[in-house]
Amino acid sequence: MKLYRHLAWDGIRKNSRLYVPYLLTGVGAVSFFYILVALARLPEGTLPGSGSVQVILNLGSFVLWVFSLLLLFYTHSFLIRRRNREFALYNVLGMGKRDIARILCWETLLSGGISLAGGLALGILLGKLAELGLLRMVGAATDMVYRVSAGGLLLTLGLYAGIFLLILISSLVRVGRSTAVQLMRSQAEGEKPPRANWALALLGILLLAGAYYLAVTIREPLAALTWFFAAVLMVIAATYLLFISGSVTLCRLLQKNPRFYYQKRHFVSVSSLVYRMKRNGAGLASICILGTMVLVMLSSTTCLYFGAEDSLRTRYPRDENITAYFPDRASQSGDLTPLRTAVADAVRRSGMSAANVWEYRSVSSVMTLRDGVLSPNEGFGNPVDVTLIPLADYNAAMGTDLTLPQGQVYVCRSRTGYQGTSLTLQNGPTWQVAGLLDNFSPSGSDSASVVTQLWLIVPDLSAADDLEQVMNRANMGVSRSWYYGFDLDRQLPDAADPVAEAIRRMAQDGGLMENGVLGVESLAENRGDFYGSYGSLFFLGILLSVGFSLAAVLIIYYKQISEGYEDQARFDIMQKVGMTRRDIRSSINSQLLLVFFLPLLLAGLHLAFAFPFVHKLLLLFNLWNTRLLVGTTAVSFLAFAVLYTLVYRITSNAYYHIVSGGGER
């Protein structure tokens, strides 16, 4: 037993160039996962909006575990490929498959033990720092209590031990099915270029074009959410197809160009790429996809976090947002003075005063707009939230003195691109558009609508009768409401609003409305949930972006190291026939520049076309600040490009060190 343990440890030590990054990957994955599950298990009340924060963190931990499974399997394949010759020699020298299996068991036990112990220790060590960072991001109070989650430790230990067990089973199956000759040849065996390259390339182009078309043509946020994951799958498939088949096609075209191919700096690099292009293309595609994930995730979550106040103020434009819903026109058209007086009394009893009052009545319904005709939305076509506001309420709210004859409407351009000269109700009257207004935006719950909104200023509420008749014929109704919002003369602490509580108590006692329902939304009460959700998304975005970036770096490193060992013999031969070290460096730069920056360029292209998608998805969070999203996207790409270039310089030097004779054979 000691012999097998010694051989396993000796194998890890001799292949430290490959094993150290693998072990660091395991340690990092385990520590990141433990931190997420430990944060999701913080005591109740520690985080604002703890329900949504826990859901986000648990979802993130699941994504991280699945990603860890794929990444550890991927990196372990490089180790096994490098160790195959060693296992073949053991077999030739008299060791049976069972003996090799015992060595593999010890290697997995050692590497898994180091990863689990180191990862849990690092996770516990950094757990408090991560907790303080999360609490700061969500705007919660911090404490100095050091917590260790026993449940998080057990869950992390069980799930990641399962990953290493699966890796062991995969290695045993691979070695068990191979002969000594196959193991000996596998390390140096080239790969045949895939067949039907043009067909695969064309399929990849079509898939990518389809995904890009969806990204730039979808207008509705809900439709963007529906099609987003389909577009992501299309982009992933297209990226793999283009890198695998397109790289082969590119190499063949370069080989057919004698002036390019038969140069010292190009001959070795291009010829070696052809024999491993399937694996090389898959690695480049993985780097591209990881880079795109980092860019999209970091730019969107950063935009959400720094735009949280804008989003909060869009959803809750006043400190207190009161909406009364009426069952019919008579109650909506009645005297609203008692409601205003009761609200003012509640504010006064709380020791505060109201300011910046904003109020209006409205009648709304979900319809379909096509060629200037409004019809009931019965599940077909894109929905449009149509809202009618009487001119008197608009003039009072905006301080204007507009006039409007019967049969005409003003169109508010907020969130709608309607440019027609008239609007016709299905089987109803036609309204002429008297003009476009720019300075009126929805408030209260109306601001949370994620469908296209069409706000119409009508002469009076009688115009809504025609709308109600059209909707009633389709067995659909309208919503009649009155919005009353105001700011308070001093800022309230988060999650505490005595004014909102007083108004709710009055509504529950039946002293405010005889007919209808009254709803109260407080900015102070909801601020904690907003910052809790957005802050935790930003925290998760940073954590996963770091993880995905390290994964991309790891793939680049293993790609360079493994290809360096494969190319070592080729460059050794070329040196013997006259190639200098300067020629080797020039050839290496030619090879790396040929394929290395393609993932970065394509990731940038993916990000550019994903921008409209991301923008529409952020509208679901009431974030309309396009300029902020442009800024975070640009900064994210520049930062990732700098990191990518640094990794390129470091790994190209490691590759050169190996092929020029500095690495072990």
Question: How would you name each of these model-derived features?
Answer:
Residues 1-30, 193-198, 207, 242-291, ...:
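N-terminal Sec/SRP start-transfer signal
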Residues 312-550:
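Basic-flanked hydrophobic alpha-helices used for secretion and membrane insertion
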Residues 38-50, 120-152, 209-226, 599-662:
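Short helix-loop junctions at transmembrane helix boundaries
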Residues 110-254:
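Hydrophobic alpha-helical segments
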Residues 17-45, 52-88, 108-122, 236, ...:
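Hydrophobic alpha-helical transmembrane segments of multi-pass inner-membrane transport and secretion
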Residues 19-23, 58, 153-158, 198-202, ...:
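Hydrophobic alpha-helical transmembrane segments
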